Every structure is written in C-alpha cells, then in structure tokens.
Amino acid sequence: MREIVHLQTGQCGNQIGAAFWQTIAGEHGLDGSGHYTGSSDLQLERMNVYFNEASSKKYVPRAVLVDLEPAALDAVRAGPFGQLFRPDNVVFGQSGAGNNWAKGHYTEGANLVDQVIDVVRREAEGCDCLQGFQITHSLGGGTGAGMGTLLISKIREEFPAGMMATFSVVPSPMVSDTVVEPYNATLSIHQLVEHSDETFCIDNEALYNICMRTLKLTNPSYGDLNHLVSAVMSGVSTSLRFPGQLNSDLRKLAVNMVPFPRLHFFMVGFAPLTSRNAYSFRAVSVPELTQQMFDPKNMMAATDFRSGRYLTCSAIFRGKVSMKEVEDQMRNIQNKNSAYFVEWIPNNVQTALCSIPPRGLQMSSTFVGNSTSIQELFKRVGDQFTAMFRKKAFLFWYTGEGMDEMEFTEAENNMNDLVSEYQQYQDASVSDGEEEYLEDEQLEGEE
C-alpha cells in the first residue's frame, strides 16, 4: 500500500492537524480511541495509507506531532481524539520559538530536529511502500515556519524519492498575530519553493471571509476556521484514502498539477460550505457544486482567480454522482470561463470521483487549482516584507540567532522571481511558443 507519513508542527499546524485526524477518523469509522466501528468495507480498504493497524484492531495515525513548547500538544492530547496518537510520536521542547523564524530554523528547532527525524524514520520503516509526507504548519510563526521548513529539508535529504506535500497557512493583514509575520513567511516561502513538491495555500483572511459572508458567523473562532481547513484536507486526500475512478497518489497529483517545478502553490476550495453546527438540509446538485466550487468567494486563499489564469486544476467529487454529469458541468465551466484557463496546456482540468461522501453530506466537491493569481498572495507578503526590511525593523531578533542579512535578501529575490515566473506564464500564449519554434527552425535552416 502507498503510505503517507503526516507531520504537524507549531500551534497552528497541530490544531489543523488535530481537526484533520478527527475528520478522517470519522470518515473511516474509527472512534476516539482508534477502534473500528464502521459498516463499510470501503472504509477499511485503504485505511493503511494514513493509519497503522496495532494490536487488538486499534488503528493508530501515522502522525508525528512537533512543537517547541508543550501547550498546543497538551491541548491536542486532551481533545476528543487525543487518545488516537502514539505517545512516542509526540516531540516537544520547552522554550518555544517566540514567533522567531531563526529560533525555529537555526537554534531551538535545530536542537530538536534530530529527535523528530528519528521518529519519522521509525514511521517510514513501518511502511510497505512509502509514497511521501504531508506537513501542516503556518508560515507566520516561529515553530511551524522555521522548524517546519527545516524538517522539510531534512526529510528531503533522508528520503529524496518521497513526495512532499505541505498545507501551509499564509499570514494575512486582516488576521495578524505578530508584527514579524512577513519576515517569517518570506523566509519560509524561500524554502518551500526549493523543497516542497506541492503546497496547498490556506489563508486566514479568506477563511474569515467565508465564515462571515457565507456561513453568517458573527465572530468565528479558530475552531470554525479549522473545520473548513479539515474539510479541504479531507477532500484533497479522498482519492488517496478511498478507491475511486481516478486514483491519484501524491505523485500523480503533482504530475497533473505542476507544469513547472517551482510553480507548485495551489489554491483550494470546497463546496457546499456548511458551518460546524448546521449540516446542509437541502439537497445539492452537481451544477450547484460546480458553480460554488469555482466561485472566488469559496477559495481558501485571499486572491481572486479572475486576476490570473489557471495553469491546471483538479476537482474531486464525492457521493453518488454520475461521471457524465460531472464531465458535462466541468466542460460547461471551462467553455464559459475559457479566458481564465491557459490554452497552451491541453486537458488541464482533471476530475476524480469517490462514492463515499463526507460525514453529514450527500455529496461534496473539493477544488485544487494552480492559478497564476496566487502571485497576489506572494506580492502582498513581499510588499510588507520590503516595507520592514528597508528600515531593518526587528532584524536584530534574527541576526541575534546567528542569521545574516544576506539570507533575507536572497529570500526576497527568490519570492520576486516566483512572482515574475507566474506573471510570465500568465501572459504567455500559444503563438509565443510557435514563434520560438519557428525561430529555432529558421536558425537550423541557416546553419
């Protein structure tokens, strides 16, 4: 079987991770202690992608929980599914990273990282055929961003063939915890461009907007935001966990979604959107799901895809859905919005079906898009970074941990390059390719 080892680092990563495990344990028919109480063989068929079967029919998540202070991990273990995790897989320090990327990446985190890699190695050795890793973390803090990216690069060295997927929460100006978020995020993106294979960008601002506008929650809690994120994570991993018509593993997803290796930052969306307490009482149809899924208001990254173009996208439908209806609807959307899809990548929209819907819903759809409009998100962080870096504000927090200003400049340049690469492919057209091809032909002819 194609197993995935899951890591969650920092407070944000652990809270999202806990919500994810709660969601998929429910979908696979597991109770809070990991015993199977479900009714369908389909739930068991690919259970061991994410779970190890221990003695006495107990299933244990292949998860490694990491933090530089014990508080968030204690909260996870005291939660409803806290008994699920293997106690040896919980690794924590005492000092915390104090929202400082350098502490997570170079000092405090570096002291703890070998211990974490030992746990990861043990989990990987328990797999028959490891397909890769997924990590949940935020890019604005110290542990998730600094230590999270350190772990990614260490795992890359140790398991070069494994895929690396990250669920990364990008800081947003509306929902800001600390003043140095732009530094932490830019330094992290610099790492992710090089070391990650696929990064699902989640944005607190977009999540807040969804909660306020669509779900009509007056003051959303982090629990509500995490509920949305876990719905998307569960949707993205559906085709890995259940048998379906288009069984993508992490590598197939990357092959279908990433046309150029550096451009692996995805926008995600989910439909139908429901709040935690009110599962939808009306039946949804495939046209409605498709419409909602492509709606900019449903995207969990605060960018508008209408300001860019899709290089590739993938939709995962769950529930009793007919393949033909889905294909028709997806074709319909493409025809109506053809300006928003690049024409030089043929068949750039994939659809996958899975017959098991999420809990409490008749059917649902999850959307993953590789759109050039994601550059808005990097620009936003980059502008804030530049404004602070020009004045060298708060730099001493980082240089004090042994970092050099040069690293900041490199990270800034790398992010600017990423933005201009997205822009280049947004502007590219079929004729550009043909002209280059003709020029090459002429040159060959002249030779």
Swiss-Prot record:
CDD domains referenced in this protein's UniProt entry, alphabetically: beta_tubulin
Cited InterPro entries: Beta-tubulin_BS (IPR013838), Beta_tubulin (IPR002453), Tub_FtsZ_C (IPR008280), Tubulin (IPR000217), Tubulin/FtsZ-like_C (IPR037103), Tubulin/FtsZ_2-layer-sand-dom (IPR018316), Tubulin/FtsZ_GTPase_sf (IPR036525), Tubulin_C (IPR023123)
One Gene Ontology molecular-function label: structural constituent of cytoskeleton
Transmembrane annotation, as ranges: none
Main location: cytoplasm
CC cofactor: Mg(2+)
UniProt subcellular location: Cytoplasm, Cytoskeleton
Binding site for GTP: 11, 69, 138, 142-144, 204, 226
Any one GO cellular component localisation term in the record: cytoplasm
SUPFAM superfamilies the UniProt entry points to: Tubulin C-terminal domain-like (SSF55307), Tubulin nucleotide-binding domain-like (SSF52490)
Keywords: Cytoplasm, Cytoskeleton, GTP-binding, Magnesium, Metal-binding, Microtubule, Nucleotide-binding
SMART domains: Tubulin (SM00864), Tubulin_C (SM00865)
Domain of life assignment: Eukaryota
Residues involved in Mg(2+) binding: 69
BP GO terms, sorted: microtubule-based process
Protein family according to the UniProt entry: Belongs to the tubulin family.
Function description: Tubulin is the major constituent of microtubules, a cylinder consisting of laterally associated linear protofilaments composed of alpha- and beta-tubulin heterodimers. Microtubules grow by the addition of GTP-tubulin dimers to the microtubule end, where a stabilizing cap forms. Below the cap, tubulin dimers are in GDP-bound state, owing to GTPase activity of alpha-tubulin.
The protein's assembly and partners: Dimer of alpha and beta chains. A typical microtubule is a hollow water-filled tube with an outer diameter of 25 nm and an inner diameter of 15 nM. Alpha-beta heterodimers associate head-to-tail to form protofilaments running lengthwise along the microtubule wall with the beta-tubulin subunit facing the microtubule plus end conferring a structural polarity. Microtubules usually have 13 protofilaments but different protofilament numbers can be found in some organisms and specialized cells.
Name under which the protein is recorded: Tubulin beta chain
Species this protein is from: Trichophyton rubrum (Athlete's foot fungus)
